Amino acid sequence: QLRAFVCRLSSVIFYETMYVGIVLLGLIAFDRFLKIIRPLRNIFLKKTVFAKTVSVFIWSFFFFISLPNMILSNKEATPSSVKKCASLKGPLGLKWHQIVNNISQFIFWTVFVLMLVFYVVIAKKVYDSYRKSKSKDRKNNKKLEGKVFVVVAVFFVCFAPFHFTRVPYTYSQTNNKTDCRLQNQLFIAKETTLFLAATNICMDPLIYIFLCKKFTEKLPCMRGRKTIASSQENQSSQTDNITLG
């Protein structure tokens, strides 16, 4: 029964949230791109209302395409059928599952290509800026690089390995000529990279820390650092005043 629950509900929710995360990362990358390349244009895209509307639309879209995958897994669960989630689906369920799979693959590869384009352009812009500054402010340049590239790092660490593995794995499942040993190896690779995709939940806070100032200011450890830094500055200014006096 637990395995049937995984097939009908939890795995569907997992994949739904994974692709929501992929799309949102793509939008964050697009936001970084606009801020660096066109900082004074497209002001309406930066408004909170617009961001909330897009977020609600994305979650609603993935919910409605995922819901039939839960409903159409309606065959009786037996010890043999739950070994493969597709066995719980009828012909309509299998067809819808394939449609959703194709949509998901299209979304990932679209975001993948766009992210490459965005960050190639951003990297060139950052490099040109770094060269013009003649390394006078190396510390700030390093901070900027960290902030700019954290999104693409999370994307490639969490999501790219799974989708690179999923292509040959899916082919091996649909091709009867594939060697059984190779199928098992690809299955292990797919499950391992799927674990990496699940670690995205741990990587998301890095994006908030690097890119969201309001979030960082609310962290107790960061507030402590800020207090220490400000007290050190006050002590330094007091010392300077005493010395000058």
Swiss-Prot record:
Keyword line: Cell membrane, Disulfide bond, G-protein coupled receptor, Membrane, Receptor, Transducer, Transmembrane, Transmembrane helix
Under InterPro entries, the record lists:
GPCR_Rhodpsn (IPR000276), GPCR_Rhodpsn_7TM (IPR017452), P2Y13_rcpt (IPR008109)
Q: Name one GO molecular function term.
A: G protein-coupled purinergic nucleotide receptor activity
One Pfam family, please name it: 7tm_1
**Gene Ontology CC:** plasma membrane
Compartment list: Cell membrane
- Annotated transmembrane regions: 10-30, 36-56, 86-106, 127-147, 175-195
Segments in the Cytoplasmic topological domain:
31-35, 107-126, 196-245
Which PROSITE patterns is this protein grouped with? Answer: G_PROTEIN_RECEP_F1_1, G_PROTEIN_RECEP_F1_2
Q: Which cysteines are joined by disulfide bonds?
A: C7-C85
Side Extracellular, residues: 1-9, 57-85, 148-174
Give a yes or no for keyword Calcium in this entry.
no
Tell me which family the UniProt entry assigns to this protein.
Belongs to the G-protein coupled receptor 1 family.
Role description: Receptor for ADP. Coupled to G(i)-proteins. May play a role in hematopoiesis and the immune system.
Which protein, by its recorded name, is this?
P2Y purinoceptor 13
**Species of provenance:** Macaca fascicularis (Crab-eating macaque)
Q: What is the lineage of its organism?
A: Eukaryota, Metazoa, Chordata, Craniata, Vertebrata
Tell me the name of the encoding gene. Answer: P2RY13
